[in-house]
Each structure stands twice: as structure tokens, then as C-alpha cells.
Amino acid sequence: MGYGICLDLLREWCEKLLELQIHGTGQPTLDGGILCPACARVHGRCFDAIYPFLYLADRDGDQRYLEAAKQLFEWAEHTVSREDGSYINDTSGPWKGTTVFSVIQLVEALKYHGHLLEPDVYCRWKDRVKKAADFLRDFEEFEVCNVNYRITNSLAMLLCGEFYADDSYMQRSQELAEMAEQCFSESGLLIGEGRPVDGYSKKHCRPVDIGYNMEESLPSFTQYAFYTGDKKKKAMACKALRAHLSFMLEDGGIDNSFGTRNYKWTYWGSRTSDGCLFAYLMASQEEPEFAVGAWRNLKRLRACTEEGLLYSGPHMREKGELSCVHHSFSHAKVLAMILEHGLESRLCDGILPRAKMKTP
């Protein structure tokens, strides 16, 4: 079921991103970046498209994507790269925590598709990512900020530890993963996407954001658990995925109406996160019902795609709201990962937990 939809959707998004890539201005802080028609700017994380671009360059033999990926890398070096190894989130702000997302996709790009690059380019990229990995290893702020960062960095450090054969990364990965274990409630909900991360508010509440949990934190925790084979963490990941699946609507939308970061809520998830598909498909070997959630959400992404871009909801275009490119380049990474790992064949339809709930 659904065979081919991941590749078709990935090609559609990436073709539009190619169209929006800036060329020929002579300004290194512009050329290579991807212009957002909704925000009238170049988003600092647009070079997250490097991994899906290289995937398509490799799969389809399309030289355009290889050149676009290299241009994106150079754009990032001139614009958001910093001397300490970090990447800032945007030129208008100093936050460096999003370096973790850049490192994850760049390591995956080098691991699977680095052979497409010229030897000197490959070495330069590898050295640059190593510098970013060193920054992440020593960035202690992840221990006190929103929970998604300690979890995603545990995955980043794991990937870098394996790629660079560096035990210091592996040790840091394990430390952060152990910290993450403390952030799950008895019911399986992930807590800590807000302040206080490890405590209670004055009204004795805990910060929870369904969108970020399903599309960013749980996917990274699931990958960590399955990549390491840690049985305890695999069980925790499956319990959490099951608990959060109750917030998926029958049409594949996600209910994040009460989330601590619901200002980023979209009908299918959250604006700047990567998506829930890979996690649910990866864990579907343990619980086949998870593949149903992946299929429904994928269909919702397909339904919300118009003119080559992923819109935030099913009626946004007809209301005159333009689509932010962040939606497309972030979720393109997940589609590439699904195809990379051959998980598309697991997609299936069925009944979601929401449909089984009895109403009074």
C-alpha cells in the first residue's frame, strides 16, 4: 500500500525547492539559499535540504541536486556557520542549538551519499561536521533547555560517534539518552517541551507539546533505541509512540491544540520539525498498528501539498496563505530516510486508536 507515494512526494517538494534556490546575485550570503515565498526571506535551516537533495542525486542520477546540495553547503558556510563549530538558527538570532539538526542530516548525507562528492569536497564537509559535533558534545545548555534538544543530540552524538569512531561522542550520547528516560510520564507522554523541563509549574502542570513530541523528539529517541538495540529504551519508545498516537485524527491530522508550542501547530504536526513517519514505520516491526498512523499522516501530507510545497493545512492555499518552505525541506528529510531504509513497504491502513475510543 502506498508504494511510490514517498518518492513522488519527495521529488515534488525537492523540485520546487530547486526552483526557489537563489543563483547569480554575486552575494555569497544569498546564492545557494532557498527563498521562502511566505516569509520573503532565506531561512537559516534551509540547508537541511542537503540530505534529501543528495538522496535524489544518487537515486535518480540527477546532477542538479548534487550541485544544489553543494551550493547550499557553501551558503551555510557564508551565512549561518560560526567559528565555534555551531550553526545559528537564523541570521536574526543567536540560538545555536539547532546545530543538532544540521549535524544529523549532514552525517546521514555523508554516510550514504558522500561518494557523490569530489574527494576534497568530501574531506572539507567531513571536517566541518566534525567541528560541529565537537560543539554539540560540549554544549551543556541542552541539559536544561527543552527536552527535544537532549533527545535529538543523543541521536546526533550516536551517529557522529559511529561515523568518526569517537568514543567521546558515544559517551555523551549515552549520558543524554539516560537523561531523556526521566522525561516520560507513567502514561507514556513525553514531558519537558517547555519550562520547567524537569519540574512542575506553579499550577502543578508539566510542559507537553504533542506536535514536537511526535515529529521531533520521539523519532530521535526511537532511532536511538533501535540503532543501539537497547531493549529498555525500545519498550519506552513504543509505549510513548502508542500514547501519542491517540492524538492522531482519523484523517492523519494531529491534535496539538493544547501543546506548549501550539503557536507552531500545523494540521499534520509542527512547523519546523521533521515528521513522525520514520519513527512509526521503524517501530512498526514491534507494533504493526504504528504503520497505520504513518500511512494516515503521509496521506495528510500528500493532501496538504499544492504547487510543490507542503501547506500547513488543507484550506490554507484557498484562503490566500502562502506556504513556508520550512515545512517542505524539513519533512523531505524524513521521506528520504524512509526510502533509504526501505521502510515504505510497511505502510498499511487500518483503525487508529482514536476511532476505538468510546464517547459518553
Show the residue positions of the predicted features.
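Well-ordered mid-protein domain cores that form the structural environment of catalytic cofactors
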Residues: 78, 89-138
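Buried hydrophobic core positions in alpha-solenoid tandem helical repeats
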Residues: 17, 53, 69, 76, ...
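Solvent-exposed loop and edge beta-strand segments that line ligand/cofactor-binding
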Residues: 19-47, 83-100, 136-151, 187-216, ...
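Low-complexity, Ser/Thr/Pro/Gly-enriched N-terminal "stalk/linker" regions
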Residues: 1-45, 55, 59, 63-74, ...
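Alpha-helical junction/boundary sensor with strong preference for TPR arrays
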Residues: 21, 60, 80, 113, ...
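Terminal, non-catalytic domain-edge segments
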Residues: 1-27, 223-227, 231, 235-243, ...
